[in-house]
Amino acid sequence: MTDHSSTPTGSVSGRRLLLTGGAGFIGSHLTERLAADNEIVILDTLRRNALVSAGLDKHPHVKLIQGDVLDPAVVRQSMEGCDAIIHLASIAGVDTVLKNPVLTMRVSLLGTMNVLEAAAAKGGVKRLIDFSTSEVFGRYAYNVTEWDATTLGAVGEARWTYAVAKLATEHLAMNYWKQYQLPACSIRPFNIYGPRQVGEGAVHHFIVRALRGEPVQVHNDGSQIRAWCYVDDIVDGILLALEREQAVGHAFNIGNPRSTLTIYSLAKEIIRLASSSSHIEHVPWKQADVELRIPNIDKAKELLAFQPLIDLEEGLLRTIYWYRRHLDAP
């Protein structure tokens, strides 16, 4: 198995970091990597909480504040003493976005404004990482670079409220750097999966159904193509962006273009690796969807020395192992 302990990210130590949305899937993995050598403050509504299953909720270096980035006073309080901010808080998951388009935009737009305003006013922040999305590239994104034009869907399609709000936060982060010298950068994650991905996501749904012997439901014919990135790899990318001066003022695609598969093939692979008796069931999906999404990560390689390490089979096996131990646990 690939070991991330020897990657360049081990240099992050002796810091006090604020993670907004830090109790979520990716935030819990960041906390797990950072908590031994740093103080971590997590601001989260706890709508979803992956910290408990990771055993991090009682960690002596982790301070959890239950609150909302929409509350400027709570944001300012959470930021006290912190010299780095990783802003992950958002409404996550396509199904949730479709049901809550206004809240999706409020949390991304107003929440990010609150974080940027507080950080700029506070001073002493050495790095702010804004979490964006690969959805800014729209429905067709093949080998896309950070210099390619972003593409959004039609107004009125609720799915794109997430993407348009995230694209706006990228512009905000870049211009807080240019206008106020707040050292910010943005991360565009491409289809992250792994243990503790509770709630939504194709890998989550497919593994849960496969382990229960239920039909694995694929939208339409399953020909949609994705590049899948294991969570440990994006944690590497985030921590490199935290440490490297070259990151400031840039957006970065973080993903694994080597692990590319159709949704249908992903479902088949999960059924195989889980030794499941499940079959694939095609279900209609009439909402907007992304047909093709594969990143070009040359910029992250050049400026951050980022390199994804976990291939798809290894990542899926690790994830299935975690779900076997935690599925239906109290």
Enumerate the language-model features and the residues they cover:
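N-terminal Rossmann-like NAD(P)+-binding domain of SDR-like oxidoreductases, especially those catalyzing
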Residues: 1-188
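Generic structural signal for alpha-helix termini and adjacent loop/cap motifs
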Residues: 29, 49, 100, 118, ...
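NAD(P)-dependent short-chain dehydrogenase/reductase
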Residues: 140-149, 167, 171-242, 257-258, ...
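Short-chain dehydrogenase/reductase
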Residues: 97, 190-191, 251-254
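Solvent-exposed, non-membrane alpha-helical residues enriched in polar/charged side chains
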Residues: 67-70, 76, 116, 174, ...
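Residues in well-ordered alpha-helical elements
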Residues: 73-76, 83, 95, 102, ...
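C-terminal substrate-binding subdomain of Rossmann-fold SDR/epimerase-dehydratase oxidoreductases
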Residues: 10, 210-330
